[in-house]
Amino acid sequence: RPALAARAPDSVQSPPVAPGRKLVGVVLYPGFEVLDVFGPVEMWAYVPDFQVVMISQDGGAVRSAQGVSTLSDYSFASSPQLDIMMVPGGIGTQTELNNNAMLDFIRKQNEKTQLTTSVCTGSALLAKAGILKGHKATSNKNFFSLATSQDPSVDWQGKARWVEDGKFITSSGVSAGTDMA
């Protein structure tokens, strides 16, 4: 059987957190947008002081909106504290807006992150979690009303490609996440 046809494992051994490196965690969920995740990951992979990990509610494989599965390094329960958290967008955002485990994880991690970031409709999840109150933020222009309806106390910026406000960096549609990173 060719190596490329080999079945991927259902789980991976979580990598140890390397001392002195910033831990960048990407929060995956069913229906995430591939480019929202892997555009920024490509940029962060070149930063020598960054260690990038994938996190999902239950760990294991998570299927994207494009049908490609990605293995999580950690579940919400096993995740270490992140220095930088990134929440991508995707069609699955609409389901996750009602997922208390997701919203609780975002709130808990955000308490101690140095940066909390999002791509596309990921900002809707940050807003729904209540962590963007009083901050400037943006989202995908095609789904802007989805994000803005989650928390009207956010200072939503409709024309921005990305917005930095304190420790929050939000970006609009897919490729803007690469620019943000």
Give the role of each language-model region.
Residues E164-M180:
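Conserved anion/nucleotide-ligand pocket segment
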Residues R1-T116, S123-K128, K133-G134, F144-K159, ...:
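Extended, subdomain-level signal for the structured scaffold at the beginning of enzyme domains
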Residues T93, T138, S172:
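A short glycine-/small-residue-rich loop at the edge of a beta-strand within enzyme catalytic domains
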Residues T138, G158-E164:
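FMN-binding flavodoxin-like domain, especially the glycine-rich phosphate-binding loop
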Residues T116-S118, T170:
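Conserved SAM-binding loop
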